[in-house]
Each structure stands twice: as structure tokens, then as C-alpha cells.
């Protein structure tokens, strides 16, 4: 975790420091090595939130786009089980940053628990994901809408879309660079993707403004599209 409580203040890890978990009040130790980002770890091996994944520089870079008070916000479900949101805004929106592999049932549970949630997925974890994504776009013809190229694709076209395309929530795929590939809408088997600047994404979230979504219009006749399964 990035923060622990020390004298009732949220602080980041420093060498040799000890603190208290903001969620479960257990003792935490600062881990300040050279291979991983500096972080806090529970004195015991078990994290109080079993949904938690080890934080990477990628997680930290994303969290840094938002104010610290919105980071690592704890909440309990109806059974008293603790969960810690990566980002939770005062407007009730949760953003989860997912780097490691995750089981579909856990995604569903976390999505149901948070309700109003956006998932940001690290698209660089598997080398084949970017290859599949770029190939998919090269075999599709975008439509121009308000100056944005919108691609109509299908879940079976890439592994990432198979995993995340039917969630029914906004999903952003981060392949590095300055833009997110946003999936904000679906219609039947179709999914609609477009690039959106990360800076603008964070700005809209921080201001409590909605992200752009695809507005469905009357279908247009398209040329032949090659289809490929992965």
C-alpha cells in the first residue's frame, strides 16, 4: 500500500518506518528496497483486503494523477469484509487499476461491490495484447465522430476484449503512451473503442464531469471487413 497511518496522518513509506493500516488498524512495516516501489506491508503476510494486488510503478503513476485523499479508500461490505479502492472520488466513482491476471468472478464481485466503477487495464503486461490490438484496428474502418475515430469491434477479436468487453462498465486499456483506448459503449455484439488522452481523462474525473460516450445512430453500410479470431 502507498499509505499508512502515523500519528493519525496518512504518510508514505520511508526506510525503517512503522505505521498502522488505515483499513484494519494492523501494524505495517515500510518496505523500501531497490526493486519495487516503496510501500507499506502488513507485518503478517496476509493483506486485509484479499482483492489487493502488489503495487507497481504503473499503479503509482496512475494514482499520482489524482489527489492523495482519493487514493486507497477503505470500505466494508454488508458482511464486514474490507476492500480498498485504488481511487474513490467524492462523487462515489471508483477507479480500479489492474495489472496482474484476475479471475472473471473476482472482476464481477468487485464491480458489483463498487457499482459505479471504471477499470483501467495494463495492456503492456502480455506482449501479445498490443499486437492483437493494433492488428484489430488495422483490419477495421473507423467512423469519424466529433473529430474522434471510433472503431466498431467484437469481443472475440482480441484476448483483452474477451476478458473485459462484456463487463458493462467503462474500461480503459493502457498500452503506454499518452492515450487510453476507451471502451465506453456496447450494442449487441459490437463494442466501440476510441483513443482518449490520459490527461483529459484524469481532468474530467477530477472535475466530476462525465467521460465521452458513443452515441448510437442509424447503422451505416460498411465495406467488407476481414475477421480474425485469436
Language-model segments: residues:
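Short hydrophobic alpha-helical runs that function as membrane-insertion/retention elements
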Residues: 116-121
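Non-catalytic C-terminal interaction segments of nucleic acid-processing enzymes
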Residues: 2-16, 20, 124-230
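Nuclease-adjacent, charged terminal/linker segments that flank catalytic cores
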Residues: 1-71, 77, 211-230
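Active-site metal-binding core of divalent-cation-utilizing nuclease and nuclease-like domains
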Residues: 12-13, 27-30, 61-109, 125, ...
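Short, conserved loop/helix-junction motifs that constitute active-site signature segments
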Residues: 111-114
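Helix N-terminus capping/helix-initiation residues
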Residues: 56, 103, 195-197
